[in-house]
């Protein structure tokens, strides 16, 4: 079955979601009967697999722990024209799935993010204030570094085209995968959009797997790693500038003293200043070399991306 001529696949990463997965599958099938549902179980110790199979979902087991490993497997194993990814905790609004897919197809986008908004009476329970602030800070960090205008970078509710999914390398292992999904779209200058979606509390018996500080720290490290790999000249240029300033602070008094009396009063300091200046020069050179390598990598990823056709919305199957 096809929706607007497209094979749409719902891909659901799961870990111990027996209390929620049945509602997820049924709600999305009700909202879009044409959707093909895949549940990717990540070493659950409860009845997640059995419950998902009982409501007709196709279940795939992923032995490597971590959401990033699951996303990598989902994009590799599922063959579809449009992918809708949603967490298996029944917190996202299934009725918004048509809005995400329609916006993806109508505006020829490669990714649409479902931005979370909560009702005031359940906001504290569903979307904790600390998570909201953390999401805002991390989202703004990515926007400042990589550009774009994302509102909810860490949303687990997204729609992708086939060419996005098949060009995404998925290098992260855990919950920081959402950061990588966002940066991938930005670095390849992909068209993307956002749709506001309702966000609710988990059903009774379902427990969050998120750790505010641990996962926040991992996301920060991912942003740093991506900054170094995607903006190497900026990173190593800043490092080189700092080293050069330190060298000048140490060496300038020695230089003025040498010009005045013809002697170097503190030879070890002079050697240190010269060594730091050499390190600064090497940092600049490394930045230039790695910047060219990054450009070449971006070109190759862009060619892979362009080699996959966009969804043909003009034909009906």
Could you describe each region identified by the protein language model?
Residues 1-4, 172, 177-317:
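Hydrophobic helical membrane-anchoring modules
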Residues 7-9, 36, 180:
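Cell-envelope/extracellular polymer assembly enzymes that use nucleotide-activated donors
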Residues 62-77, 94-175, 200-217, 222:
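Acceptor/aglycone-binding surface of glycosyltransferases and processive sugar-polymer synthases
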Residues 41-49:
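A conserved acidic beta->alpha catalytic loop
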Residues 26-35:
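Short, acidic, metal-binding catalytic loop of nucleotide-sugar glycosyltransferases
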